[in-house]
């Protein structure tokens, strides 16, 4: 896959994501225990209007909402995210297709070392804050 096609697929994914609704479980607004944890659960009731995909009911996830396969799961910049805990893990990355995300358990001193080494290797760090 060439660079132009890759960028085109990233744009297609961004356009699809803008239109994608939030998929929430059936009647999530009705019970407080669902409001605090609004994640998808498939409707399974025999009389469920949402399962029958009736007009006016919330949308259900289906394969048509997914991103193009070649760019699925990538960072919006087009890089594959890799979680980094130390400098040794950073050196295994491919700077052309992978970007580093420093783990939240890493302290300030080691974070500075990782950022310096990433700059030397030409690796993009997705969360460079100090």
Curated annotation (Swiss-Prot):
Name of the molecule in the record: Large ribosomal subunit protein eL32
Primary gene name: rpl32e
UniProt cross-references to NCBIfam families, sorted A to Z: PRK08562.1 (NF006332)
PROSITE patterns attached to this UniProt entry: RIBOSOMAL_L32E
GO molecular function: structural constituent of ribosome
GO BP term, pick one: translation
Family recorded in the similarity comment: Belongs to the eukaryotic ribosomal protein eL32 family.
Domain of life of the organism encoding this protein: Archaea
Disulfide bonds: none
InterPro entries documented for this protein: Ribosomal_eL32 (IPR001515), Ribosomal_eL32_arc (IPR023654), Ribosomal_eL32_CS (IPR018263), Ribosomal_eL32_sf (IPR036351)
CDD domains linked: Ribosomal_L32_L32e
Keyword check for Chaperone: no
Keywords: Ribonucleoprotein, Ribosomal protein
Annotated GO CC locations: cytosolic large ribosomal subunit
């Amino acid at each position: 896959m060439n660079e132009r096609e890759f960028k085109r697929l990233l744009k297609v994914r961004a356009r699809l994501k803008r239109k994608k609704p939030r998929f929430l479980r059936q009647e999530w607004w009705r019970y407080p225990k669902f409001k605090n944890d609004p994640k998808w659960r498939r409707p399974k009731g025999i009389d469920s209007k949402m399962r029958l995909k009736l007009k006016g009911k919330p949308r259900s996830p289906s394969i048509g909402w997914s991103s193009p396969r070649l760019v699925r799961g990538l960072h919006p910049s087009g890089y594959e995210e890799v979680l980094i805990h130390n400098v040794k893990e950073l050196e295994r990355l491919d700077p052309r297709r992978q970007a580093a995300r420093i783990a939240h358990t890493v302290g300030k001193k080691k974070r500075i070392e990782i950022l310096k080494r990433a700059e030397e290797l030409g690796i993009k760090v997705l969360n460079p804050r100090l």
